[in-house]
Amino acid sequence: IRESFDTSIGTIEDVEAFLHVPVLGVIPREDRKEIAKTIKEVFPESLDPESLELLASISPLFDLKGITAEGYRSLKVNLQFACQDREVKSLAFASAGLGEGKTTTVLNLAITIAQDGRRVLVVDADLRKPTVHSRLGLKREPGLSEILVGNLSWQEVVQTAADLMLGKLGFDQILSAPGADNLNIITCGHLPPNPSEFFNSQRIVDLIAEFEANFDLVIFDCPPILPVADAVLIGPKVDGVVLVYQVGRVGRTPLLRAKTLLENAQAHIVGVVLSNVSAEYSPEYQKHQYYKYSS
């Protein structure tokens, strides 16, 4: 009961002081009206509402000068600095609870890195409530589950720019998107009865090694840490874990517990990303907006 009244951490300094890990990025809250306006400017042909909604959540794909794209470029650079003392080929992104912007962060960071010319693989490791496929307008099956049970190889299930073109995002939208040809996706596949068994097996270790050998960076979109054990099982098997935290949504006690669970499992926590941050928490973004519109 006490936790339900827990005060959330409000500033970057508070987060770093409380968790003792660096804040790698601050992703600003988006103005959906502005994004819709930009989409119509970039793609003047009429788009159906579903395509508009999908594009709005991955605006760095087409709006490289926007404030969201800037936020993800900063995250990319800070990640590189945070990992400069060790080779990082695989990362897991996780959050304490539901709805903290983890999948949005994973997809937009992957897009940003792909725009640099690096081959990126996004793996939907949420075998309970997966969303990567729906967020990109792709089919869910086959995917990771089929690979882990041995029915298919990863080469048979990986989806590429060609699949994105034929999906709900639209042919022209992907064709004109910088870096889309470097973006690779493995969706979750069928939903198994006990996903934790998959992530506690040698097969996932071998599979991660295969991914690392074939891509510049592999990013796992994991389920939230506190409800299920999956992210804690994956964490030690990849090169680093990034926590995604939405200011004001989750209290500091659950956030600290999530970090502690990862540390107890010997996972290497690279840092934390603050998602959906309003200007009141990050006044520097107000300044950024001023310069953006006055330039």
Where are these regions (language model features)?
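Phosphate-binding/switch loop-helix module in NTP-utilizing enzymes
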Residues: 79, 166-228
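Conserved acidic residues
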Residues: 89, 184, 216, 239, ...
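Conserved G/P- and acidic residue-centered "switch" motifs that form tight phosphate/ATP-binding loops
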Residues: 20, 103, 124, 221, ...
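Inter-motif core of Ras-like GTPase G domains
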Residues: 213-215, 227-248
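Structural beta-sheet core signal
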Residues: 122, 185, 220, 243, ...
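Short boundary/hinge segments that flank catalytic cores
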Residues: 1-119, 127-145, 155, 163-164, ...
